Structures are given as C-alpha cells and as structure tokens.
Amino acid sequence: MEFNTYIGRAGTGKSTAMLNQIKNKMKQDPLGDPIVLIAPTQSTFQLEQAFVNDSELHGSLRTEVLHFERLSHRVFQEVGGLTEQRLSKAALEMMIFHIVQQHESDLKLYGSQAQYYGLSEKLAEQIQDFKKYNVTPEHLNQLIENHSIQTRTKHKLEDISLIYKQLESRMNGEFITTEDSLQQFIEILSQSQWIKKAEVFIDGFHNFSTLEYRIIEALVQHAKQVTVLLTTDGSHHPFSLFRKPSEVLSHLEDIANRLNINLNKTYFNTFYRYNNDDLKNLENGFDALQFTPKHHQNHVKIFESSSMREEINEVARRILKDVREADYKFRDIAILYRDESYAYLFESILPSYDIPFNIDTKKSMTHHPIMEMLRSLLEVIRSNWHINAMLRLFKTNVLTSQFKRSSYLIDLLENFVLERGIYGKRWLDEDIFSIDQFSRMGRKSHQLTEGHQALYKEVIKLKKNVINKVLYFEQAMNEAHTVKDYATSFYESLEYFELPSQLMTQRDELELAGLTEKAEEIDQVWNGLIQILDDLVTVFDDQEMTLQQFLDVFDIGLEQLEFVMIPQTLDQVSIGTMDLAKVDNKKHIYMVGMNDGILPQTVSSSSLITDEEKKYVEDNAHVELSPTSDILQMDEAFVCYIAMTRSQQSVTFSYSLMGNSGDEKEISPFLTQIKELFYDLEITNLQDLHKAQPLLMMQHSHQTKIQLFEYLRGWLDHEDIDYRWLDAYLAIRDDDQLNQGLDYLTTSLTYDNETVQLNEILSQQLYGKTINASVSRFEGYQQCPFKHYASHGLRLNERTKYELQNFDLGDIFHSVLKYISDRIYGDFKNLDTKNIQSLTKEALELILPKVQFNLLNSSAYYKYLSKKIGSIVETTLKALKYQGEYSKFVPQRFETGFRKSPKNKGELVAQPLITNQGIPINIRGQIDRIDTYTKGDHSYVNIIDYKSSESSATLDLTKVYYGLQMQMMTYMDIVLQNKERLGLTDIVKPGGLLYFHVHEPRIKFKSWADIDEDQFQKDYIKNFKMSGLLNRDQEVLDALDIRLEPKYNSDIVPIALTAKGAINQRSSKVADENIIYQLIEHNKKNFIETASHIMDGHTEVAPLKYKQVLPCQFCNYKSVCHVDGLIDSKRYRTVDESIKPLDLIQQLRNEGGERHDSN
C-alpha cells in the first residue's frame, strides 16, 4: 500500500516523469505486473498514442490506459459480480420520462411540466449528480421530514425524491446505472488479483466527485501503489489560482489519514515544457499578486478582429503560415474555444483553407436526414397525417431516393397539397390525386402536354409509394400493445421500407467517393437507432403502453443520440473547449473568443437544484454536492491558466469586437492582465495590420480570391488600395492552376442590377402581336416595369396556398352581391330585413363551397369567417337599400364584362387602341355595377366599383393623371361607348365614378351612456358614403341624392352645399363634364404610352414611389429583382405630387390638346 502524489505547476514535467517511469518499467519487464493509467475520457486516446508511437515500445501488453468506467468494466470481467443490465443514457431518460408520466398527478411542483421532454433530461442529470456524490432518496426524505423547508424547495425535493425512489425500485436487481456500477466496483475491488499487483497512476484530473474519491481510496487500499498527479503549487489558500486542485490534495491527505498511511509528495519545480521566456513569464505571472514585467520576444500574441468570422479566418491564415514557414505539422497546433458559436465557424471556414481538423465534441444526430425522417414519421402518426408533418417526411428524401428527380417531384407535390390543404386521410383519396386535379393547379384548368402528364403520373406514383409505407407503419404500430411489440413492428417497418439495404448502399457510395466521415455518420445513425429499440425492449419488455406513450418515450431516446467522430487522419489541428480539451505540449496554441463574459464566464446554475438549495442540502443532510456557481466562478482563472500553458512554443490570443448577432463585445480582463506581463506586448488590430501588410492575407488561393474581390470592388469605386492586390490579381489571372473561378468573381465586380431591354422579336414572342390585357396589368406596369415583365413576360406565379387571400375575399363579395343583385333585379330599396337575411344565406350556400376547394368549410376558424362574411353582406345590403331610397339612379347591370368581341349580349364592346408600333390594344375587364338615370333624351351613368379594402376605395386624381389608377376612367369610357347595348338614349353623359366600400363599420363611443340610437344610425350609414368624382351638372347632383338642398351634406355621395346652395368645394368631389371627358382621353393616352413601352421591351427595375410608399412593399417579385431599399434608391421613380390634376387637364383642354366627343 503506497500512496504518492506528484505536485507542480503546469509544464514542470509531472506527466513526462510518469510516462518515463512507466516506459522504463515496460522496457525492463514487458510482461511484469500490470500498470494502470487512469485519465479523463477525452485524454485516453492521446495517452495510448504515446505508447504506440514510442519507437522502443511499439505498444504495450503491460500498461492499460483507462477511465474510471472502463477500469470498473475491466475488474468486473475478472471477478464477475455485475449481473444487472447497464442502462445507457438514452435508456435512463426513457425510463425516467415514463415514471414521470405515470406519477404526473403525484408531482407537486413538476406535474404541469411532465409532458416536456426537457424535464426528464434534467431529472436524469440531477439523479446522476446525487449518485456521484452518494446522496440517496433516504437522505432527501430525512431532510424533508426533519427540517422546516421553504414550500417550493420542499415540493421540489419531494418530487425528485419520488422519481429517484421509483427509479431505484424499477431498476432493483435488474438494471444499473454507470454510477451504481462504480459503487459495486468499489465493493468487489478487494477481490481483484489484477488490482492487487497493479501500480496505478491517475493523471489529467483537476477535481473528483465523492464517488471517485471513494474509488481512489479503495485503490490505495488494494493496489500495490497509487500515484496521483496534480497541477498545483500546493497552496491551500481558498482564493488561490490552484484552489480546485489544492482542494483535491486536501482530500487525498484525508484519505491517507483515514488509512493511517503517508501521502508521499514529490514536488516538481523546474519548467521543461516552455522553450522561451515568454511562455515562462506567462505561466509564472498570470494571476500573481506581484509580478515583474518582462520584455516581449514575440511568442505571445494578441489580436482583435471586427467579427468572429474574421477572427477565425485570421487564425486559419496563421495556421497555414505556421505550417509553411515554421515547418510545423498540423498536429502541432491546437485551437481552444469557450463560446459554442465558434464550433460552426470552424466547420464552415477551415475547410476552405484546406486545413484538416478534428473538433473534440459530440454532435447531435437530430438533424441527420434519417433521424429527420424517423421523427417526421412519428409526427405523422401523432398528428393524424398533418400536412406539415407529411411534407417534412417527403422532403427528407429518405423514402423517395429511388425516384429520379425526386426533389423536383416532391416540390410539385408540395405545390399541389398546399393549394388543396390536404390533411388526414385525404392523402388516400385517389380522386384528389389524379391527373385531372393536377391540371387545375394554380386555380385554373390547363391542357396538359404528354410530358406534363407523364411528370404528374410520376408525382402520383411517388406519393403512393410513401403513403403505402406510412400505412404499413401505422397499421403495424396500431396492432401492437406491448413495448416489445412496438419495437418489433418498428424494425419490421424499416425493413419494409428497405431502409437497411438503402443505407448500406449509400454508405458504400460515400466511402468510394472518399467521404468517410459521412459514411461513418450513416453507420452511427443506424446503430444508434437499433440501440434505442434494444433499450426499449430491455427496459420495458412486455409492458403495455398506448401508441402515443410509446412514440413519446421513443422520441426521448432519439433525442439523446450523438455522433462520436474519431479523427480521420493523424496530422490535423486539434480543436476543443478550454474546459475539457486535452492538448498537452502543442507547439502553437490559439485561444479564440477571449471576450468578457466568455472568459471569465458568468456561471449560473442550470440544474434543478439551485445554488442556495445545494448549500442548504449540504449543511443539513451532511453530504457534499457538485460545486455551486460561486465556486465555479472562482475557478475561471484556472481554466484560462490550464488552456494557455499547453503550448511549448507560442500562444496566440484573439477576440472579436462584435458577436454573431451584431452585439458589441469587450476584451477579457484576463487578456488585459496578460498584456501587463510584458513591456511591449501590443494588441494587433487586424484591420490596421492587413492595411499595412496585405500579403499576410494571401495565405490560400481560394480565400485570397475572395479578399481580392473586396479590394478590387473598392478600386473600381476609386478607393485607394495597396498595389500588391493588383499584382496578386495579375499573378492569379495568369496562372492556370490558380485562376479557376476568377472570371466569375471579376464578372460580379461589374455586375449592376440592370435588366436588358427586349428587342422587338422577343417582345412579340412574350406578349404577342396583340395586347389583350386588363386595366390592372397596365397599372402594374406603371408601378414598376419589371413587375409587369415578371408577371406577364416571364409569367412567374407565387405558390398558391390553401388559405384565404385578400383578393379571395373581394371575389366572394363581388360574387355574392352579383347573385343577389340579379335575383332582385337591382331593386335594393325594396329589400326588407327578412329578404336580406334569406338572400344572403342563399348566396353564401351557393358560392362559398366553390372558394378554394371548399376552404371556408375546412375548419372552425373559416366557418366563423363565413359567418362574418354573411354579416358584412347583410350590412352592405342595408346600406345599399338606404342609398337606393334617396337616389334617382337605378342599378342596371352587375359584373358586366367588356372586350373587343363580346361573347354574349350581356357583355360590352371595348374599342381597340393602337400602340405607337401599330399593335392593337384590346382591353378587357368587368364593371361591378352600372347605374343609370334617364330624363327626356338624356341618360346619365354611374360607375360603381365594390372594394373590400378602405385604402383602395379612393379615387386619387393624381394617380389617374400618372396612369397609376386607370380603372374608373376606363369603365366610364366603355359605358359611354355602349349606349345601344345598354338601352340608353342617344345622349349619354357621365354621372359619377364611385367606389363603394364593402365592410362592417365599427362606431366608437366614449361610454354606453353616450350612445344615441339616431346618431348611431347616421354614423353607421356615413361609413358607406361612396367616394370618387361626380359630374357637377345640377341634374346629375339632384338625381344622385334627392334630398340635396342648401347646407346639406350628402351621406351617399361626395357632395355638399353651402348655405347659399352653392357646391361646397372642400366637402365635394366634383368636376365639369368636359373635364371628365378630358380625363378619359388622358387615360387613353396613358394606355397607349404604357402599351408602347411594353412592346419596346422595357423591363427596368424602377418602382414608382408615391406618398413615401413603394410598390415593392406589396410586390411578389422582390426575390427576383433583388432591389435593395438601402442602396437602390437611385432606381426609384417619383412624380410631382404637388400637382393639381384638374387644373392640368383644364390647361390641356384650353391649349387644344385632348378632346372628347361625348356622343
């Protein structure tokens, strides 16, 4: 029984002395008594390599490198005694989750959180922590019974104790955790002859749990010799840099005292690791209360960067410089980090520099396509085939990889199901998934070519293939009752999917392509999945569960699966966290992310037991628990010390001034402290360094080209750049091995987001030799020429979704109002409440099922919306009744179409216009409502357009003038051209151009007491007052509102009279008849100019900004035109918004410009 400890600061040769001692014994007696080297899990591989790579040893039969768990396994193999099944991490969490579900009603604090997966994970961590520190359910129960505890803490401890006790009961004699197996290992250690003959060395630890101290004590009792290596100066001061390892030393002394033996201490005071004074000064002066600054020899460097990405780019450049100029191997270099955000940056940046690396961290399998497929499959069953879960399943492409162009087929299928809102067992309806239904995609029926028919047949075939697999899986799972049945059915389903053979084929293809890491991932995913199924059977076996319970427990298991990737090559950069990485004796260490808040890190408790509760439990239950946050905070300096003393030659510290989310970051106070250790150590600003020495950025051809792009862009913008960048460009351009991709970069330098004007032939191919178009198409061109080109030239369409759009609502109102108007022949004024209700119900029952494949009957929300639509229609009809009672104008036509060649007598004729190129313009459309009033040989017409949006229910004459609002003038022109078809007199004149807002008004009152019924009705009707422009002819005004008299303000149309009977210009919207004709003529001119521009091939990205609003705000093509609001303001067109359109039109008329012959 010999107990030793090696004590010394970092770099004093403790580990080297131990290894040399072991090697000498192996050389003297290769088959002698066993030597056991116990190290942390992450260090075992490196230590094994130390023996394998030794030229004199070439491995070892006598020495074994183990961590505590593997040591216990080795002893159990020798003496037996472990009969229970060891639970994996996933199995433990699945068992705890199931216990929580069973006892949900018994939990006082965590009952409401029982369904959350995270709770079982936290409970597993807490129970494992208790086991490491030898805390049992009895300890917790005694604490609760014998002490007065705060209610919340009491309920928490009662819940944890209940779950802990149930877990112990469930495992009793059948299962065992890692911590329990270590407890048993301690008990049977005395039976091991192997241990009795062994010399044990323990290295790489800075602290131990209570359980590990008990193992060390048992080893000291039964092994020939135990030696523990500690990085400490032996100081026991509570605020010492070495507080943590010194605490370990105190525990070792306690063990020696209990065993009544001496703890032999060997002190190491000479530094061997550091090859220069910089590193010696760094080690010696860090965290010292008194230090003497030394002159800097350039072996310790600090640089700051503007961003984290630029920081890692600089590290990559410096690594290449190390390898190229200092003759380092990649394996001589390590990168240490603390902020998890850096892990992604390493994986995205280092490969672009061709730097091999290995990150010593486990990565979740959650986002692997196979795992995504499995979890989607579970969600499909859980959600009763919800559309989102089904599409996720398809998009993994795991079940559809046998189809050519499967991704494209899935995209087409997605378009279809999103349009139809497929859910539940509608996925099985073959009438929905038919060629005929696919031909109606986009709300219009299309004649399919043979090629399209074949394509959609393949889509249907792909859909059926996946649906059959899902049906098989669902049926198999529904027939199961026990966990063993479920697991068996699950595996059989995977075989039915032919997944095992598919994955083997993929793995072989990846290995042939040299993608060994990706191939290894497939192996690990499959093995992990099988392990979860095995764990389920092991833990639950024939226990009955509902399908939902099984899927929940299974999902918990999948959550725990992680990739453990072994290094793919021996010569690679080691990357790890500062807390865990084992990277001793590297030539160059890069410590990145040295920012305040990261090092030192603000430590907070993330366990179920808070720091205050830990202290309470320790004080009253007389146990020791894991360190609290304040203790861990004290050890932050030690974390930094251990990380920076791993190097033999150089250490480079770096930090960024800005985080990934754009937040400002500060330098770590540790770096400020390190800087003070040297007289002339300066922090290098990368921006200044690269400006002065641009060659430092040119370490790799690919990245140099990317940087070159930035500098050449500045050069083209007449910025001053270093001539060496131009030299680099010429060198790369003239080198066939380096210039790949350079043309693409240089082309993008001169790229301007400009479209090309189409030639005459291409314009006619896109638009035809005749322009057949609606008014809105011309308005769209005026808003932005590119918008017109994208929608009508390229014919780009947004994906149609199974949801109600704004234009759907407008279409519904138009259809319902037309139906009712036709039924009553436009006689709104004679409607009564009963008629209004019955007609509305009748119209909705007929029209709503036709909207978006019966969308409005698909959910409770849409059924409520249907009722709301009905209420709005009824309100609108009441307003129309009121307006009809006080107007001489009579509704004559509803939803009246017009075109060059009418299809029937009900449609109107639209006379073609001619572009400047001589191309006919055939305008077509539909007028919502035409009202007429005839007196003698004069007829007057109103154009009324229904709008469901208040913002669009306004006639803006400035917009009319500039061609942004062409609808009303066009409609009036068409009606005036068709007096015969409308049955009007020979003399037809414009009455009003009016918008009617279809809505349900909301009247605001300060309080219930302020409500006056008469005033309420007046305000209600005023909300339906039509807006627009009226002919100021007194005959027209009198007919529009028969109540017109002095001091009267109409609540029907925009007209008001003064006390003297004159038109109130402020409250009225009127114009002379000739002005209206002039507006119509000007509108025609806008049509001709717009159509001529279209046929000239204009496609500019040139949105027209009006009243500080851009059409881009509501445009569907922003992702195509790439217009940028910050940098493309020069593209915006504007108009003079201060003009008075009616005055301008009058001026044109006076100058003899545009004229109109009314008849």
From Swiss-Prot:
<comment type="function">
    <text>The heterodimer acts as both an ATP-dependent DNA helicase and an ATP-dependent, dual-direction single-stranded exonuclease. Recognizes the chi site generating a DNA molecule suitable for the initiation of homologous recombination. The AddB subunit has 5' -&gt; 3' nuclease activity but not helicase activity.</text>
</comment>
<dbReference type="InterPro" id="IPR049035">
    <property type="entry name" value="ADDB_N"/>
</dbReference>
<keyword id="KW-0067">ATP-binding</keyword>
<feature type="binding site">
    <location>
        <position position="784"/>
    </location>
    <ligand>
        <name>[4Fe-4S] cluster</name>
    </ligand>
</feature>
<dbReference type="GO" id="GO:0004386">
    <property type="term" value="F:helicase activity"/>
</dbReference>
<dbReference type="Pfam" id="PF12705">
    <property type="entry name" value="PDDEXK_1"/>
</dbReference>
<dbReference type="InterPro" id="IPR027417">
    <property type="entry name" value="P-loop_NTPase"/>
</dbReference>
<dbReference type="InterPro" id="IPR014017">
    <property type="entry name" value="DNA_helicase_UvrD-like_C"/>
</dbReference>
<feature type="domain" description="UvrD-like helicase ATP-binding">
    <location>
        <begin position="1"/>
        <end position="275"/>
    </location>
</feature>
<feature type="domain" description="UvrD-like helicase C-terminal">
    <location>
        <begin position="269"/>
        <end position="583"/>
    </location>
</feature>
<keyword id="KW-0540">Nuclease</keyword>
<comment type="subunit">
    <text>Heterodimer of AddA and AddB.</text>
</comment>
<keyword id="KW-0238">DNA-binding</keyword>
<dbReference type="GO" id="GO:0046872">
    <property type="term" value="F:metal ion binding"/>
</dbReference>
<comment type="similarity">
    <text>Belongs to the helicase family. AddB/RexB type 1 subfamily.</text>
</comment>
<dbReference type="InterPro" id="IPR014140">
    <property type="entry name" value="DNA_helicase_suAddB"/>
</dbReference>
<dbReference type="Pfam" id="PF21445">
    <property type="entry name" value="ADDB_N"/>
</dbReference>
<dbReference type="InterPro" id="IPR038726">
    <property type="entry name" value="PDDEXK_AddAB-type"/>
</dbReference>
<keyword id="KW-0227">DNA damage</keyword>
<dbReference type="GO" id="GO:0008409">
    <property type="term" value="F:5'-3' exonuclease activity"/>
</dbReference>
<feature type="binding site">
    <location>
        <position position="1112"/>
    </location>
    <ligand>
        <name>[4Fe-4S] cluster</name>
    </ligand>
</feature>
<keyword id="KW-0408">Iron</keyword>
<feature type="binding site">
    <location>
        <position position="1121"/>
    </location>
    <ligand>
        <name>[4Fe-4S] cluster</name>
    </ligand>
</feature>
<keyword id="KW-0479">Metal-binding</keyword>
<dbReference type="GO" id="GO:0000724">
    <property type="term" value="P:double-strand break repair via homologous recombination"/>
</dbReference>
<keyword id="KW-0347">Helicase</keyword>
<keyword id="KW-0411">Iron-sulfur</keyword>
<keyword id="KW-0004">4Fe-4S</keyword>
<dbReference type="GO" id="GO:0005524">
    <property type="term" value="F:ATP binding"/>
</dbReference>
<feature type="binding site">
    <location>
        <begin position="8"/>
        <end position="15"/>
    </location>
    <ligand>
        <name>ATP</name>
    </ligand>
</feature>
<dbReference type="InterPro" id="IPR011604">
    <property type="entry name" value="PDDEXK-like_dom_sf"/>
</dbReference>
<keyword id="KW-0547">Nucleotide-binding</keyword>
<keyword id="KW-0378">Hydrolase</keyword>
<feature type="binding site">
    <location>
        <position position="1115"/>
    </location>
    <ligand>
        <name>[4Fe-4S] cluster</name>
    </ligand>
</feature>
<keyword id="KW-0269">Exonuclease</keyword>
<dbReference type="GO" id="GO:0051539">
    <property type="term" value="F:4 iron, 4 sulfur cluster binding"/>
</dbReference>
<keyword id="KW-0234">DNA repair</keyword>
<protein>
    <recommendedName>
        <fullName>ATP-dependent helicase/deoxyribonuclease subunit B</fullName>
        <ecNumber>3.1.-.-</ecNumber>
    </recommendedName>
</protein>
<dbReference type="GO" id="GO:0003690">
    <property type="term" value="F:double-stranded DNA binding"/>
</dbReference>
